[in-house]
Structures are given as C-alpha cells and as structure tokens.
Curated annotation (Swiss-Prot):
The keyword Hydrolase does not apply. ATP binds at residue 332. Is required not only for elongation of protein synthesis but also for the initiation of all mRNA translation through initiator tRNA(fMet) aminoacylation. InterPro entries: aa-tRNA-synth_I_CS, Anticodon_Met, M/V/L/I-tRNA-synth_anticd-bd, Met-tRNA_ligase_1, Met-tRNA_synth, Methionyl/Leucyl_tRNA_Synth, MetRS_core, MetRS_Zn. Its EC number is 6.1.1.10. The lineage of its organism: Bacteria, Bacillati, Bacillota, Bacilli, Bacillales. It catalyses: tRNA(Met) + L-methionine + ATP = L-methionyl-tRNA(Met) + AMP + diphosphate. GO terms for molecular function: ATP binding; metal ion binding; methionine-tRNA ligase activity. A motif ('HIGH' region) lies at residues 10-20. Binds 1 zinc ion per subunit. Its cofactor is Zn(2+). It comes from the Bacteria. This is Methionine--tRNA ligase 1. Zn(2+) binds at residues 141, 144, 153, 156.
Length: 544
C-alpha cells in the first residue's frame, strides 16, 4: 500500500513553538508506524518561505526576506531532526523546484478553465504606495467582531476577503487603506461544489476526517463555495507564468498546499524513484495540521487535485485543535509560548513527544503546563516505563552477570502482546494516537504489577527456574514495548534496542531475545520538581 503523509508547512518568520509540534507530531507517528509495517511511505513537508509574514518580519528588521527565511528554515530543520521527525523530504517554498511545480499546476488549471481573470477592488495603502495582500490588512471580523487578518478569522474560522473587514488597517504602517481597482486571477472553486460535498459526506461516514474538519467543511459547502483569488501583488513568491502578469504572484490559496506536490516531485528526482503511486486514487493519504489550516486541506487542495486530474484527494485529515500554555492562548507577539529550540536544550525529546501525544488536542483544546509536563515525565516515563526496564535489566546484571536467563514465553503474555499490536496499530491508522499510547502504558503498568506479583527477588532463592522464567518474560515485554513505542518515543526505543541487540524492527511481536545484556543505564532521569518554578518564572518574565 502507498501511504502519503503531508505535514503542514510552518512560516519561516519565527521560531517553532509547542503549538506547532502538537499539530505536526501525528505525521511522524504515522510515518514510523507504516514503515514498520512495511508499507511504501512518503512523508513530506517544508518551510513556507513565500508567506506575507516573512516579508513583514523582514521589513520590520530591515533585512531581506531571504535572510529571514534562511535563518528559520535552518532552525526548523534542526528542531525537527532533534525531535526525531523522519521526513523523507523537507524542502522550502522559495526553491526553484517548488516555483516551477506551482507554475505548472497554475498553467494546468488555467488550461482546463478552472482559473480566470477578473477586475476587482483591492485595499491600497497610500502611505506605503502599494496594494495590500490579505495578510497586510488587519481589522475586525464582520461575523464575530473579533480581531482578524484579511484572509481568515482565527476566532470563528471564517474565510475572509480584506474588504470584508471592519476598521481596516495597513499592517505595515497602521493607516487606513483606500480601495482601488486591479486585475487578478481567480480559481473557479464553485465548480467543485458537488465533489467537495461528496468528499465530506464520505469522510463523515468513514470517520476519516476529524470532527472539526467535517463541521467546518459542511458549513462552507452549505454556504456555497466561492471563487477565490489566486494571484496577489506580493513582494515575494511564485511569479504568475502568464505574459504581462509576471509582477503578480501566485497566492497562498494554491501555492502553499501545492508544496506537498512539489516536495513529492523533488523527492522523486532526488531518489530516482517514481512518486506517481502516491497521487493515485488508491493511495492512502494523511494531511496533518492545525484547525486553522482546515479549509486549505478540505476544500482548496482537493479542488486543485481534481482540477489537474490527480485522484489522491485527502482521505484522512488530522486537524488538531489548539494547544494553550498555562491556561492561556498562545501569543507569539506577546511571547507567551514555549519555544521549541529552548525546551529541546533542557529536556529529553521523548518527554516532549510523550506529553504532546497523551495531552494532544485531538478533539478539543488542551493545555501545556510545566507542572503537568514534569510530573508526567517523572511518573509515567521514569516511574512506570523506565522503572520496569531498569529493575528488570539491573536484576539480570546483578544476579546473572549480564547473561540472559533461559525461559519460554508465557502463553497469556504472548496473547496479550499480539492483541496489543493489533489494537495499537488500528488506533494509529484511525488517528487515535492518544488511545494508542495510553494502551501501551496500560500494558507497562500491567508489566510492573507482573514483576511485583512474581517477586523474582524471592523466587531466586525459593524457585530459581521460576525466577528465570519471570525475568525472561519481563525482557520479552521490554523488547515489545520498545517496538510498540518506537513511533511515539523513538529515542528511548533505540536505546533499548541497542541494549537488547534487537535487529527486527517490523510491526510484529519480538520473539528473539538477547543472550547477554551489557552496560545497563537508566532509560530516563528524574527531573527536579523545582524546575517547575524556574520554568514558570522564565515564561512570565519573558512576556511582552
């Protein structure tokens, strides 16, 4: 089976925060799981280096947009690598390859009659002497009356046009823009109304989209899909490949999401492999992002794919809700966030991955609190999982001189592990990552109980053969926990695999156990709870 996984492209205008990772982490869990199953996986993403936020940041700092994009693209790559993300291709939207692919898609849509020209009114800043693209205009949402950008309201998820906004202001200088006529290209989205309606109906029946994606897309379909501008007067981006319009840029509506397609083509060229199977209607596709990106993946991208004749429209939409910090909404402008480069300096990446999975905003907003983060590490990763691994392997080191005791796998334990693989695998495929991880940790707690009830420290003297059986089965459980947890906690899984000399990495019960165990080290270290206050002081002290 061909599995395509696309992770949303973060804007390269500032550091990643935990909100980004909370929405993107499911992609890596899926990729690791499906590779272990032996499926053909293509997992792609990249940095959005063309977005308006980058141009705005560059202007504010007095540097070029390229300098801003380079800085944060490199930082993103480093952060994703240190968090264990296993992208097959992580690229950027200002690459020559991406520009060429997007222009080809634009021309194909134009040839097929899905794009047309239209004279429209647009916000124009007399002070800055330029037309203002959507994100250069800010104001009040006409629907919910909250603060909004010219393209979308984060408060009510309404898709907007800058002219819809009340109390419009230029983001660059703060002045009120005038309205002037200009010519732009439009995507005939209304012609895909029935196909998008059918797609959301199927998703509702099969449960392959998150509820927020279903509800929001049903709302758009009910209101009637509106044609959307796909060109803008932007300083950076992909030029319109039509004579006389080269100064205009292809707008984010189709440019950014086409990044999945360009990354796929880039991967094919780099590896010499064929990527066509990932765009066939039989491919299983997952798109992983936050709820603010739903319309791009449930409406725009399917319409683009249908317009160019590709069959692999989004089958699974994994659109997480928002992550708050200490019960408050994340705010990058106010510096109310936990920044990824910062947290990675002091904490185990598996601790971050664990917390953001068991507390994932899968169906509702969830909160990151330093207290919960540190206590979850100490009680679950260290106290439950690390404790079971350490007490078992230390027992072998102390009483058997590192030589693996002989034994046979208990039938009940074998059956339990086989059922666990099936249950966890199904949960991952259904994008129920929290359920999957909690199920494994239920088994970890069972394993600790098994160790306590068998009392190998007493069996060693009273019934040495039974003691060997107990420890043998504990190692069997550890080997399989490492395998089951690899999609979630890859770093600690790798440490266990190295300790146990595990070679087989397939998604199946591990029956081959080591003959010797050397250099047993703690799987996790305890975090001093005093660190909670230090982190809170740092967080509150940095607020602007």
């Amino acid at each position: 089976m061909s599995i395509f996984i696309g992770g949303a492209w973060p804007y390269a205008n500032g550091s990643l925060h935990l909100g980004h990772i909370a929405s993107l982490l499911p992609g890596d869990i899926l990729a690791r799981y499906y590779r272990a199953k032996g499926e053909n996986v293509l997992y792609v993403s990249g940095s959005d280096c063309n977005g308006t936020p980058i141009a705005i940041r560059a202007k504010q700092e007095g540097v070029t947009a390229k300098e801003i994009a380079n800085k944060y693209h490199e930082e993103f790559e480093r952060c994703f690598r240190n968090l264990g993300f296993t992208y097959d291709c992580y690229t950027r939207t200002d690459s020559e390859h991406h520009h060429e692919t997007v222009q080809n898609v634009f021309l194909r849509l134009l040839e097929e009659g899905h794009i047309y020209k239209k004279t429209v009114e647009q916000a124009y800043c007399e002070t800055c002497t330029q037309f203002l693209p959507d994100r250069y205009v800010e104001g009040v949402c006409p629907h919910c009356h909250e603060e909004a950008r010219g393209d979308q309201c984060d408060a009510c998820s309404a898709i907007l046009d800058p002219l819809d906004l009340l109390e419009k202001k230029c983001k660059l200088c703060g002045s009120t823009p005038s309205i002037q006529e200009t010519e732009h290209f439009y995507f005939a989205l209304h012609t895909f109304q029935e196909q998008i309606k059918r797609a959301v109906e199927i998703a509702k029946q099969t449960g392959t989209w998150r509820d927020n994606a279903i509800q929001l897309t049903e709302r758009y379909v009910k209101e009637g899909l509106l044609d959307r501008a796909v060109s803008r007067d932007l300083p950076i981006g992909v030029p319109i490949p039509v004579e006389g319009y080269e100064d205009k840029k292809i707008y984010v509506w189709i440019e950014a999401v086409t990044g999945y397609y360009s990354a796929s083509k880039h991967w094919a060229e780099e590896t010499g492999k064929d990527d066509r199977e990932f765009w066939d209607s039989e491919a299983k596709t997952y798109y992983v992002h936050g709820k603010d990106n739903i319309p791009f993946h449930s409406v725009i991208w399917p319409a683009v794919l249908l317009g160019i004749g590709e069959g692999a429209i989004p089958r699974h939409i994994v659109s997480n809700e928002y992550l708050t910090v200490e019960k408050r909404k994340l705010s990058t402008s106010k510096n109310w966030a936990v920044w990824v480069p910062d947290i990675l300096e002091r904490y185990d990446p598996d601790s971050i991955r664990y917390f953001l999975t068991v507390n994932a905003p899968e169906n509702r907003d969830t909160d990151f609190s330093w207290r919960e983060f540190i206590y979850s590490h100490n009680s679950e990763l260290l106290g439950a999982y690390g404790n079971f691994v350490n007490r078992t392997l230390k027992f072998i080191e102390k009483y058997y001189g590192g030589i693996m005791p002989k034994g046979s796998i208990d039938v009940e334990l074998k059956d339990k592990i086989e059922r666990l693989y099936k249950h966890v695998g199904e949960a991952i495929e259904q994008t129920k990552f929290k359920v999957a991880l909690e199920s494994i940790f239920d088994a970890v707690r069972f394993a600790n109980k098994y160790f306590d009830e068998r009392q190998p420290w007493k069996e060693r003297e009273d019934d040495p053969v039974s003691c060997e059986e107990t420890i043998y089965n504990c190692v069997y459980l550890i080997a399989n926990f490492a395998n089951l947890l690899e999609p979630f906690l890859p770093f600690s899984s790798e440490r266990i695999r190295n300790t146990l000399s595990i070679v087989n990495r397939n998604w199946e019960p591990q029956h081959t156990l080591p003959t010797r165990i050397d250099s047993v080290k703690p799987l996790f270290e305890r975090i001093d709870v005093k660190q909670i206050e230090r982190e809170l002081e740092k967080l509150y002290g940095a607020v602007k």
